[in-house]
């Protein structure tokens, strides 16, 4: 079961002294025990620092590789939550370049999201090196294409399209 905690500064938490907080699973101890075990594991193995270190290595070296091939496909965001931003020569987003990179990376055993990618404690230094080697091979393939207008000819499927988007109507001001 999920676990929730209501926390905060003591000055704000005092408000709960006069409140009755009810929860469906108040006496359910298994999730609490599991949470404690996970927190202890995270502390013992310093997983947060490890994720930031591995993510920083991937983030920085990825950007060095694509820059060395003059391919505008940089990782942006944070080393633990990054997104590949692909731009054409005019500085516009290039879904074709992103699709081509993702296609070639999958062929080399690396699956990446079109959106954000998260780094986890299970990603080893070997995984990072494997990813960077796959990227280097992918960049060699892409840099051999003479003109970016030809990228779509190398895609082995349709150009991805948005399948769902949420349109929020403007709110009226009173």
PLM feature spans:
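Conserved N-terminal phosphate-binding loop of PLP-dependent enzymes in the Aspartate aminotransferase
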Residues: 1-174
